A protein has these predicted regions:
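A compositional/biophysical signature of low hydrophobicity enriched in polar/charged and small residues
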Residues: 1-155
Length: 155
C-alpha cells in the first residue's frame, strides 16, 4: 500500500464491488472526476491489490436445488507438512467455498455447496473424514438465505 485511501478511492471501491461491469465513465461521474484520473485511480487500486479480481456471481437457484452447509472440523495437532497438505487438499475441493481457522472448541470452519443431504453425507465420509488430521465434524445445514453479499464496507 503506497498511500492512505482517500474518500474518492473508497467510493470507487464501493462502486466496483457492487457492479464489476460499471464503466470508468460511470465511476468518474459518480465520484466527481474526469475519466483519465478515475482510470488511473482504478489501476492503482488494482496494482496495489485492493481489487483482487473481477468475477461473475452465479444465481445458484438457477442451477437447481442446492444449499450451504457450514461444517466445523476438530483437528488433531498437525505437523507443518501435514497442515500444508491439509490446506492443499481443501483448496482442491471445489464444493468447499470458504475455509477459516478458528479459536475455540473447533479448529476449522468450512462452507460447503451441497446439492442434497445424501450428497453431503457421502462427502463427509468419503472426503472430509479422509483429510489429514480431521478428528470430528459438526455440521449446520442452512434452510434459507436471509442476506448474501460479497461487498465489504469500505468506510
Amino acid at each position: 500500500m503506497s498511500e492512505e485511501l482517500s474518500a474518492i478511492d473508497r467510493s470507487i471501491l464501493e462502486l466496483v464491488q457492487r457492479n464489476a461491469d460499471i464503466s470508468t465513465g460511470e465511476i468518474a461521474e459518480a465520484v466527481g472526476l474526469s475519466q483519465s484520473p478515475c482510470w488511473r485511480r482504478l489501476q492503482r487500486l488494482k496494482d496495489e491489490g485492493y481489487i483482487k479480481r473481477q468475477v461473475a456471481l452465479i444465481d445458484r437457484q438457477k442451477l437447481g436445488e442446492s444449499f450451504f452447509i457450514f461444517a466445523s472440523l476438530k483437528m488433531v495437532t498437525l505437523t507443518p507438512q501435514e497442515r500444508a497438505d491439509f490446506m492443499r487438499k481443501i483448496e482442491a475441493i471445489p464444493e468447499i467455498l470458504e475455509c477459516y481457522t478458528l479459536f475455540g472448541e473447533m479448529d476449522v470452519m468450512i462452507k460447503v455447496y451441497s446439492q442434497s443431504m445424501n450428497w453431503f453425507q457421502n462427502f463427509v465420509f468419503n472426503v472430509l473424514m479422509k483429510l489429514p488430521g480431521v478428528q470430528d465434524i459438526q455440521s449446520t445445514v442452512t434452510i434459507s438465505e436471509l442476506k448474501y453479499t460479497t461487498a465489504i464496507p469500505v468506510r
